[in-house]
Amino acid sequence: MKKFKILLVLSALVISCGILSACQKNDMPKTDDKTAQTQTTDEKSDKKNDDKSKSEIKPIVIGQTWVNADTDPTNSATPWGLTSHGVSETVFKMGKDGKLSSRFIESFKKVDPLTWTAVTKNTAKFSNGDVVDAKALADCLNSIQEKNSLSNATAGKVTFTAKDDKTLEIKTERQLQLLDSFLTEWTNIVFKQLPDKSYVFTGPYVIDSYKPEIEFDLKPNPNYEGADKRADVKILAFKDASAMKLAFDAGEIDMAFTVTPEVAKMIKDDSKNVKTIDAGYQYFGIFNLEKGVLKDEKVRQAINLGINRDEYIQSLMGGRVATGFFAQYFDFAGDVKLSQDVEKAKKLLDEAGYVMKDKVRIKDGKTLDITLTTYPSRPDLTIIMQIMASQLKELGFNVNTQIVDGIDTVAKSGEFDLILYAQHTAPTGDPAFSLNQFFRSDQTKNFTKYKSEEMDKLLDELGKEEDKAKRIELAKKAQELVAKDLPILYLVDPQWSIAVSDRLSDYQPYNGDYYIVNDELK
């Protein structure tokens, strides 16, 4: 046990040098960026007896490969993490049945191509007890649209106006066909900024304290139904799969989300619980189209043809070869056929002017260098990277590999060759969000700097088209165009393994890691 605790401390130190700076004000816990999660004095008094009995219940402890770095709801991907941690909610949410529902919106309708109206329920509350009405939704969603450019991908800049306390007017810059899907996008969470600049949210849990990228300590939100039946939750970050397994074996964590294939097998062999799900995520490579050897389309084609994706599936012990940009259980998933042709790949490199010499290709006196880059919070990608490096060496590449934190920062900098990346590409059940994010010209997450009039036109048509069958056809065409132009490299449609204790044997993860901590976790 002592050895394990030492391992855990070391793991945490490696993950981050961030420290918790917590303060108390009127018995309301806050973090260093002033995220407030509050209860009134009366509520505390009313729950005194319940709290006494609940104090005897051990917290649910979850081990993950990542933990949020901050709690600013308008900061890049932070809102996604807050929802995954059970602190925030998007306006609409995807259920286990794949259907969208909302605790905040009663109904909505399209007024004209760029205008919608929505009627709010005004029954859900923030964690401080304030009602979520039309004005509250307008305030937070407008703030997101102004401060987080990732929220502008699907419909351009969107403005929200509260006509009264139950009526919301929504105006979009580009046409939008599925308002509920748009409001399910992970950027669009419900929050309120208080006069002291702190935030309150609406999820089933509130933040008691946290250490950036290391640990989140959560308590049930008293203003969320069923709070008295929920235990406290602690989320711990592990970068090392062995340390996470040690923690799980020792009974120190109730859930390991996710575990590598090897660890999953060892846990199963010990007759312990492992849940396997279709991740919904896609594993793919991001090419740098602006500089380096990958500017040459023939070099990108050679990589696409020269790698053996089946070897990735074998090493990951599950998943499928990708057929496009979406998980294959979606009706708009691509129909791209990926195959290996090593001889054709070598011929393309020959045509590009790279001549093999001493097992490395050379052109104009320079070797064919490529650096593969990935990040530690998705261990599967490291496995793929190691295999891919060997495959590319066989083609004559001089390959370097690196694992970095802050992968999006590296991607935005443009200082990379080929990034191995993971993304849930349809968390809303619609293809428009991710296709616009990654492939529309000049979008924030278009890390490749891909520009295609044909793609932009397809995405414009997708925004205007109401017919479901035609929308599916447009999404498939967009994925075929990606396979042709190769701004990214389709790799794997993965499965994930999650280890759970007997206490959580009934827990069923879904939709990737978007709702790890949810209202059913007890």
Where are these regions (language model features)?
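Structural transition elements
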Residues: 321-357, 376-382
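Detector for C-terminal structural segments
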Residues: 306-332, 380-387, 410-522
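N-terminal lobe/hinge region of extracytoplasmic solute-binding protein
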Residues: 63-111, 200, 512-514
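Ligand-site clamp/hinge motif
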Residues: 221-266, 398
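Ligand/substrate-recognition segments at binding pockets and active sites
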Residues: 355-425, 496
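Aromatic- and charge-enriched surface segment that lines or borders ligand/interaction sites
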Residues: 106-148
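Surface-exposed binding/hinge segments that line
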Residues: 109, 113, 150-193
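Gly/Pro-rich hinge or "lid" segments in bacterial periplasmic/extracellular proteins
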Residues: 78, 176-228, 232, 242-243, ...
